[in-house]
Amino acid sequence: MERMLPFLALGLLVAGFCPAVLCHPNCPLDEENPTQENQDRGTHVDLGLASTNVDFAFSLYKQLVLKAPDKNVIFSPLSISTALAFLSLGAHNTTLTEILTGLRFNLTETSEAEIHQSFQHLLRTLNQSSDELQLSMGNAMFVEEQLSLLDRFMEDAKRLYGSEAFATDFQDSAAAKKLINDYVKNRTRGKITDLIKDLDSQTMMVLVNYIFFKAKWKMPFDPQDTHQSRFYLSKKKWVMVPMMSLHHLTTPYFRDEELSCTVVELKYTGNASALFILPDQDKMEEVEAMLLPETLKRWRDSLEFRRIDELYLPKFSISRAFNLENILLQLGIVEAFTSKADLSGITGARNLVVSQVVHKAVLDVFEEGTEASAATAVKITLLSALVDPMTIVRFNRPFLMIIVPTDTQNLLFISKVINPKQA
């Protein structure tokens, strides 16, 4: 009979919001200046990371949609993957392999060191200051006061993931919960509140990842043009929503006849853009089934600047919270949640097991721009109606929205908007 050891719970929390203020991390990722050789090597690794993260993002999206097909979806795949990569710093053997392969890394082509290096470089890139775009991403550890962590883990957590560390009294669960929730609320400018609802009585450590994004449209909508209009939930059912509009704009556009959808890219000031995918009526499931890295690449490669006479987009604010344990099991990350978990790289002992993975995201889309946080899937719907010689695009039925920083090509947020009035 297997002897059961007392296990200590470890929580993994992910939060995200997208506002227009640039956050400056309190803890720099690396004080040293990277050499040209490291930069060149990092570029190669970063391209691989972007491709891998897109694969993970769409795999995760499909699982989230299966869980609640009739609800809005918003999450930050990059925030979730970063949190799991951060966790893998302390994992060994099968636990480590499952986490990294679950993130869609090919471990015969990419070493563990290269994976962490690419996340380090990505965090450094995303946290660079800009007057036009506010984007910050960071990590933190909340550690039971009596728990002793390995120096190597602490050093790598700070060097590679810029993690802050906070001594926490988890015996006082109310105070610990407030400490963590206040931290996340502060880092997301008040947009993510009450990330933690409950703490396991055996919790000894909580890892947190947050992302904050706020950007202004390169071509903003005029609030005076916003009016109440129908958003179709189905052919016969609709809700009235505030509908923003733009007239006579030239922007990247692609009509995908193969998948029966229209793709429009709206750019933010700074290095980011939002990709809106509007399936034809009753074609959403077909488009979702083909959400693959190669599909996204084909869309982006096919975009061409086109004059759009009228574009209509709903103004909305949506949020979702997810417990990701069961979904991660479907993606092959299993052992970390069981008594077989090997997270001995954190404390030196095999007495830690992941008890919960919580993700919460908020997305606001309005006339001036977009706000979103941490694990956020951006939802904006696109509907195309062509009236020769005019091009009119109406996001007045369910659509997808993807926010991408142009300098990394990783997916910050993915959103599916089923109902703009569904908070």
Swiss-Prot record:
Gene Ontology BP annotations: acute-phase response
Keyword Signal: yes
Keywords in alphabetical order: Acute phase, Glycoprotein, Protease inhibitor, Secreted, Serine protease inhibitor, Signal
Secretion signal, residue range per the UniProt entry: 1-23
GO CC, alphabetical: extracellular space
Principal place of residence: secreted
Site (Reactive bond): 383-384
UniProt xrefs under Pfam families: Serpin (PF00079)
Entry keyword annotation includes RNA-binding: no
Glycosylation sites: 93, 106, 127, 186, 271
A Gene Ontology molecular function term of the record: serine-type endopeptidase inhibitor activity
Residues covered by region (RCL): 369-394
Tissue: Plasma.
InterPro entries, per database record: Serpin_CS (IPR023795), Serpin_dom (IPR023796), Serpin_fam (IPR000215), Serpin_sf (IPR036186), Serpin_sf_1 (IPR042178), Serpin_sf_2 (IPR042185)
Protein's cellular compartments: Secreted
Coiled-coil segments: none
PANTHER family tied to this protein: ALPHA-1-ANTICHYMOTRYPSIN, SERINE PROTEASE INHIBITOR, SERPIN
Role played: Although its physiological function is unclear, it can inhibit neutrophil cathepsin G and mast cell chymase, both of which can convert angiotensin-1 to the active angiotensin-2.
Protein family membership: Belongs to the serpin family.
Quaternary organization: Interacts with DNAJC1.
Comment, domains: The reactive center loop (RCL) extends out from the body of the protein and directs binding to the target protease. The protease cleaves the serpin at the reactive site within the RCL, establishing a covalent linkage between the carboxyl group of the serpin reactive site and the serine hydroxyl of the protease. The resulting inactive serpin-protease complex is highly stable.
The protein, known as: Alpha-1-antichymotrypsin
Organism (species): Pongo abelii
Gene name for this UniProt entry: SERPINA3
